[in-house]
Amino acid sequence: MGSTESPLLGQTTPNSVISTTLNDLSNWARLSSLWPLLYGTSCCFIEFASLIGSRFDFDRYGLVPRSSPRQADLIITAGTVTMKMAPSLVRLYEQMPGPKYVIAMGACTITGGMFSTDSYSTVRGVDKLIPVDVYLPGCPPKPEAIIDAIIKLRKKVAREIYEDRTKLQQGKRYFTQNHKFRVGSSLYTGNYDQKLLHKSPEPQSESTSEILSKTFESTSEIPSDFVKYENSVSFQESRNEEYFVKSNEQEINFQKFHWKC
């Protein structure tokens, strides 16, 4: 009577059983399905967009671009990060489920680039806001360099241990928006002294005509370099009128003099 055992049992069993740990299985599943959140603020994002085409085909690495941070575990910062965009970047990173990773793409993201010398609104390094796992220099980096950065990130994910990942999550690795406010001293509210607001102006001692009379009291004509500011409306209305200033002996006609600025 023949045996009921399969003749191929001894040949297929060693090749169909894999001995592994739960940690390695989790790492393998995560590195094979990295879902990136595209955070492009400048020209570096154009190079990443070229990966979607058939020439590079980044789908072979399991990358599926997502528009929501709650469905992504990888954020790629491509371009300049300004002070105004920094809170939104931190907020997006906080909304991503852990474990999460960051790739800093381009010189402007890593160090601020050409804007880091004299710009008051550029963040000089995105690692001051969120933790960075892979730095990708270039201005801009080529698509082949982006693929190399993804491969390096996959190797990092494959070597991770659950205990180490838990310790990193407990520590303060990045800037957070969960500030703790404290009660400070009372500030100056701007209640000015009413006496200063309603203070009447000091009366003028002499009028303009009196000043002119004293100035040209001893002369019979006005100097040629005497000028007048003529950009006001009153000058346009009264340019054809005659102005007289009474002196001690005669009247001086101001119309014959050319008024210029």
From Swiss-Prot:
**Which enzyme class?**
translocase
Q: Name one GO biological process term.
A: photosynthesis, light reaction
Where would you say this protein principally sits, based on its record? plastid
Q: Which reaction does it catalyse?
A: a plastoquinone + NADH + (n+1) H(+)(in) = a plastoquinol + NAD(+) + n H(+)(out); a plastoquinone + NADPH + (n+1) H(+)(in) = a plastoquinol + NADP(+) + n H(+)(out)
Q: Can you quote a single GO CC term?
A: chloroplast thylakoid membrane
Cofactor dependence: [4Fe-4S] cluster
The places in or outside the cell where this protein is found are: Plastid, Chloroplast thylakoid membrane
UniProt keyword list: 4Fe-4S, Chloroplast, Iron, Iron-sulfur, Membrane, Metal-binding, NAD, NADP, Plastid, Plastoquinone, Quinone, Thylakoid, Translocase, Transport
Task: Give the cofactor note text.
Answer: Binds 1 [4Fe-4S] cluster.
EC code: 7.1.1.-
Q: Which residues bind [4Fe-4S] cluster?
A: C43, C44, C108, C139
Plastid as a keyword of this entry, yes or no, is yes
- Keyword field contains Transport: yes
Q: How does it sit in the membrane?
A: Peripheral membrane protein
What does the record give under GO molecular function? Answer: 4 iron, 4 sulfur cluster binding; iron ion binding; NADH dehydrogenase (ubiquinone) activity; quinone binding
Query: How would you summarize the oligomeric state and partners of this protein?
Result: NDH is composed of at least 16 different subunits, 5 of which are encoded in the nucleus.
Which HAMAP family does the record match to this protein?
A: NDH1_NuoB
Record family assignment: Belongs to the complex I 20 kDa subunit family.
Biological role stated in the UniProt entry: NDH shuttles electrons from NAD(P)H:plastoquinone, via FMN and iron-sulfur (Fe-S) centers, to quinones in the photosynthetic chain and possibly in a chloroplast respiratory chain. The immediate electron acceptor for the enzyme in this species is believed to be plastoquinone. Couples the redox reaction to proton translocation, and thus conserves the redox energy in a proton gradient.
Name-wise, this protein is NAD(P)H-quinone oxidoreductase subunit K, chloroplastic
From what organism does this protein derive?
Cycas taitungensis (Prince sago)
Lineage, top ranks: Eukaryota, Viridiplantae, Streptophyta, Embryophyta, Tracheophyta
